[in-house]
């Protein structure tokens, strides 16, 4: 038998087997190449995704730090502004008893006595000068009557029946109150009107 005539156990010539195997390989190869992804491409895609995520985190971090710095700057400016505005608070609190003493001296002074008129005038001028000076620095006196009771600036000491003043309004001032740049440094002690029973 010649080599062409040799048959394989299945009854096929060796050339036919080679051809069949070659066709099977060709048929399998396109499927394998479609399924087979280059691991480098996958790694590149993964690294690009990680890079994009890192850049986003970095951008967010920078924005957050900028926002925190801006907030810190604003808070610092407000703190400095408050420190300037209210730096005199302790000093003004020390002056209030002096102003109260001058007020009481005027209340008890015998203004009808001609011998005391010079002293009364001196006390009035001293009190006026002192109040003018503290007003320049933002201090205001709380001494109005017949205004609604405001717990932010008034401290009610007593309630008194009154026909002249509406109920709930300030009837009288026992001790003047003071504000410094709108902040109450001492509430006015007041009597409050109530309706007659």
UniProtKB/Swiss-Prot annotation:
Homodimer. SUPFAM superfamilies: Coiled-coil domain of nucleotide exchange factor GrpE (SSF58014), Head domain of nucleotide exchange factor GrpE (SSF51064). It comes from the Bacteria. One of its GO terms (biological process) is protein folding. It comes from Shigella boydii serotype 18 (strain CDC 3083-94 / BS512). Participates actively in the response to hyperosmotic and heat shock by preventing the aggregation of stress-denatured proteins, in association with DnaK and GrpE. It is the nucleotide exchange factor for DnaK and may function as a thermosensor. Unfolded proteins bind initially to DnaJ; upon interaction with the DnaJ-bound protein, DnaK hydrolyzes its bound ATP, resulting in the formation of a stable complex. GrpE releases ADP from DnaK; ATP binding to DnaK triggers the release of the substrate protein, thus completing the reaction cycle. It is found in: Cytoplasm. This is Protein GrpE. Residues 1-39 are annotated as: Disordered. The gene is grpE. One of its GO terms (cellular component) is cytosol. PANTHER family: GRPE PROTEIN, GRPE PROTEIN HOMOLOG, MITOCHONDRIAL. Its main location: cytoplasm. Belongs to the GrpE family. Keywords: Chaperone, Cytoplasm, Stress response. GO terms for molecular function: adenyl-nucleotide exchange factor activity; protein homodimerization activity; protein-folding chaperone binding; unfolded protein binding. Pfam families: GrpE (PF01025).
